[in-house]
């Protein structure tokens, strides 16, 4: 078993031919989302984050959304984010994606909220059609970083940047058993 197979857990996937891989990256119509407005819950989530910030001054707060729960082999249960994550971000329902993290970064006497997400997989990469967990072909369109920021009124970054961001040790409070 190769390292890639171990990583994905899908040993039955066959590597596509180069011709097929190139074909899958072409011919897709653009699918921009126009007129994204802030979610109605964004105002409430902002107030909740303010109260949370006041309760933990100077502490970095980490609220993971949780991850998928496997039902059988490669079939997952319907995803539901951790309640605290949904409460403080407003991200819920079909817009919620697994493995996201809200970090409340201390900034003076308050906090700066940063939402780390797996952004939309662009169609010019293999992830678009090969990644069964996050690829758009398999699971549908997700928000780009800009779209998520417009929708939830929270600064957003790629989840791949989280580890480096947290490397600056500031002491943190984390909701356990939800982090991946």
Per-segment meaning from a language model:
Residues 1-180:
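A composition/biophysics-driven feature that prefers long, compositionally simple stretches
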